[in-house]
Amino acid sequence: QPPTDPPAGRRGTLAATVRTGFDAPYGGNPRGVTTTSQEELFRFLEDRFACAQACTECARACATRAGLVDPDGAENQELVRRKGIMCAEVCDATCRVLSEQNQADEATIRMQVEWCRQVCLESAQVFDGHPGAERTAEACRACARACTAFLDTLN
């Protein structure tokens, strides 16, 4: 219900017309805003941390893999090197976005995590075709799964 008019003797005063906190007309929250259960908050934080951790592990694995590839090697080695560098950079940037406290809005976080998920899946496919890169491909898939879980939490 909308707020009622202030008492006749107090009309025109700010104190009579502005109510905040739990005395506000809508229970302390702006219209359309609901409270989040403690369980939902814990799940959000756990999934966010798990995603950031998986991004860190993937970035490390991809940077290592890129460093092991001969820069003057065959064309497929150059692709592995480029994908490794790109995936490491995207995962590192995603970890930084997830680690910042309220520095990015939800749309920015969602876009960054989705981009990371896509790059990880593409990189895993490239690493699958490169002997010795199986662990790196698995790190990429684990990161993509963590990104998917976090995106599910945001929905």
Model-derived regions: residue spans:
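Compositionally biased, low-complexity flexible segments
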Residues: 2-20
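Amphipathic alpha-helical hairpins
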Residues: 18-155
